Amino acid sequence: MADPRHVLHEMHYVLIPGAWMGAWVWAEVAETLRREGHQAHAITLSGLDGSDDDPARVRLATHVQDVLSYLRAHAVEDVVLVGHSYSGVVVGQVAAQAPERVAHTVYVEAFLPVDGRSLLDVSGLDVEHERRLIAENGGLWPPPSREELSQQPFLDADLIQRLASRLVGPPGHTVTDAASVPRPLESLPSTFIAGKDWLSFSREQDLLKSLRRSPRWTFRSIE
């Protein structure tokens, strides 16, 4: 346990994994936060734990409800909600729908939710191509192959092996369903953490530029 003299303020972090991943991907981060004296929990979203054989049942709203249900079940308020990649779309909706429970939202190289648009709509990917892949893969969005992972410069051989053995396809509706964002993102206290080229290919550049003008948003760069 961390020396309480070194903890300025105990926070409760809830960590949401990106597409193809479960709570396991946050294990080291969660342990580091706990050593610093914080509470930290990671959630595996519906359809990503291997227990559901009907991907059509799981929608984007299901993942939003997964997080809301966790916060309510544990009576959690003033939480720091952290999302990565796909789950930025999830945590942004949770913060907009339950601002009384979310003190701060952190987007770690994450996509942002846009009301009425899906992850695929804002991602910069070929939407029709991705939809075909989902249809051909039993309704699941296929994870990147080992070859595709090996093309990522920040992944070493051990991490590539770990990811290739554990990534699973999320239900396709989670990336094709439109987001519901009842409050403007610029009104919600948030931090956006990313490398300089993150989202350079996406359709969210104008949104990011507008959010940089919000006093409630902080931007941090990964070198």
Q: Model-found features: residue ranges?
A:
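Active-site loop/oxyanion-hole signature of alpha/beta-hydrolase fold enzymes
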Residues: Q39, L45-V79, A96-Q97, L120-G124
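Conserved HGGG/HGGXW glycine-rich cap/lid loop of the alpha/beta-hydrolase fold
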Residues: L8-D52, R72
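Active-site nucleophile elbow and catalytic-triad environment of alpha/beta-hydrolase enzymes
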Residues: R162-P184
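Flexible "cap/lid" loop of the alpha/beta hydrolase fold
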Residues: A96, E100-V102, V106-P143, T174-V175, ...
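Conserved loop-alpha-helix segment in the C-terminal half of the alpha/beta-hydrolase fold
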Residues: K196-E223
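Short beta-strand/loop motif that positions the catalytic acidic residue
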Residues: F192-A194
